From Swiss-Prot:
InterPro entries per UniProt: Deoxyribonucleoside_kinase, DNK_dom, NDUFA10, P-loop_NTPase
GO CC annotation, single: mitochondrion
Function noted in UniProt: Accessory subunit of the mitochondrial membrane respiratory chain NADH dehydrogenase (Complex I), that is believed not to be involved in catalysis. Complex I functions in the transfer of electrons from NADH to the respiratory chain. The immediate electron acceptor for the enzyme is believed to be ubiquinone.
Cofactor dependence: FAD
One Pfam family linked to the record: dNK
UniProt modified residues of type N6-succinyllysine: K285
Disease: Mitochondrial complex I deficiency, nuclear type 22: A form of mitochondrial complex I deficiency, the most common biochemical signature of mitochondrial disorders, a group of highly heterogeneous conditions characterized by defective oxidative phosphorylation, which collectively affects 1 in 5-10000 live births. Clinical disorders have variable severity, ranging from lethal neonatal disease to adult-onset neurodegenerative disorders.
PTM comment text: Phosphorylation at Ser-250 by PINK1 is required for the binding and/or reduction of the complex I substrate ubiquinone.
Domain of life of the native organism: Eukaryota
Gene3D superfamilies: P-loop containing nucleotide triphosphate hydrolases
Transit peptide stretch: 1-35
Name of the featured protein: NADH dehydrogenase [ubiquinone] 1 alpha subcomplex subunit 10, mitochondrial
Subunit note: Complex I is composed of 45 different subunits. This a component of the hydrophobic protein fraction.
Gene of this entry: NDUFA10
Length: 355
């Protein structure tokens, strides 16, 4: 049900991307609601990816354990390379890209809580897996946004984590007994039918910070919820990164690894990036036709999230039909959520009958 709401929010997000260049004049919504999106005629008339993609059109992800400085390094790399920075996708990522950008209630965001996970990771209500499932969907949505930006503008992108590294948290949760084996099977099923449509990043940057140092940083940060994270959980995250993620990604893309001290020198990291040849991975096999189909996919947010809801009964992520209907109607009653963007009088949209 929550993923159904995520699809609805994502659909309006794509309209918001189209409207990014539109202007409001005296409260009248400029009409971008004709749904002009990239399609077959654009491709046939010459709007092809090869005309805008350059050597600077790269997808870079910065990965690492909790509190390793990923955000700072990713932002600095993006600034120095002239790329677009995508901060890490959290629970409220769909909210940040739709409507007025303000966070919505938990009922509309997977009915999960990161703070509750830190406080009680073994909660019997299934919060831990709902959280992981929702975050995967949020990262999937963000990765599609990043690829859409790359294919539309040619500008490179830098993300903090991605759908390709999301599983490290699932493995850590399972190893610590926070979730059931059925949850792992459900996650892997969803992942297998979604991630296959996406190209991996051109480059993965991994910040290697020992668990004791991670814990010291968490304590220094002072978040009362994060301070309850155990060293065993952090160690399992690190193990998943080093034993599974990095070896797998090294076959698909370039990988750079830095210590905590080295990661502080973003200038040196950028120099290392400039020396990379980027001579491996599936991006080299792409042509205008394959990139055309990829762009069609990533601009259709409903299709992006379509297979995150699969017909498998799992108590952690399944709710009844009546509750689904009630929450859906409540969501539709929120300001600006009843109709497509530009058609909601309660948020000031005018001249709707002319659109």
């Amino acid at each position: 049900m929550a993923l159904r709401l995520l699809k609805l929010a994502a659909t309006s997000a794509s309209a918001r991307v189209v409207a990014a260049g539109a202007q409001r004049v005296r409260g009248i919504h400029s009409s971008v609601q004709c749904k002009l999106r990239y399609g077959m005629w654009h491709f046939l008339l010459g709007d092809k990816a090869s005309k805008r993609l350059t050597e600077r059109s790269r997808v870079i992800t910065v990965d690492g354990n909790i509190c390793t400085g990923k955000g700072k390094l990713a932002k600095e790399i993006a600034e120095k390379l002239g790329f677009k920075h995508f901060p890490e996708a959290g629970i409220h990522y769909p909210d940040s890209t739709t409507g007025d950008g303000k966070p919505l209630a938990t009922d509309y965001n997977g009915n999960c809580s990161l703070e509750k996970f830190y406080d009680d990771p073994r909660s019997n209500d299934g919060n831990s897996y709902r959280l992981q499932s929702w975050l995967y969907s949020s990262r999937l949505l963000q990765y599609s946004d990043a690829l859409e930006h790359l294919l539309t503008t040619g500008q490179g992108v830098v993300l903090e984590r991605s759908i390709f590294s999301d599983f490290v948290f699932l493995e850590a949760m399972y190893n610590q007994g926070f979730i059931r084996k059925q949850c792992v099977d459900h996650y892997n099923e969803v992942k297998s039918v979604t991630i296959c449509d996406y190209l991996p990043p051109h480059l993965v940057i991994y910040i290697d910070v020992p668990v004791p140092e991670v814990q010291r940083r968490i304590q220094k940060k002072g978040d009362p919820h994060e301070m309850k994270i155990t060293s065993a959980y952090l160690q399992d995250i690190e193990n998943a990164y080093k034993k599974t993620f990095l070896p797998e990604m090294s076959e698909k893309c370039e990988v750079l690894q830095y210590s905590a001290r080295e990661a502080q020198d973003s200038k040196k990291v950028v120099e290392d990036i400039e020396y990379l040849k980027f001579d491996k991975g599936p991006w080299l096999k792409q042509d205008n036709r394959t990139l055309y189909h990829l762009r069609l996919l990533v601009q259709d947010k409903f299709e992006v999230l379509n297979y995150t809801s699969i017909p498998i009964f799992l108590p952690e992520v399944t709710i009844g039909a009546h509750q689904t209907d009630r929450v859906l109607h409540q969501f539709r009653e929120l300001p600006g959520r009843k109709y497509s963007p530009g058609y909601n009088t309660e948020v000031g949209d005018k001249w709707i009958w002319l659109k």
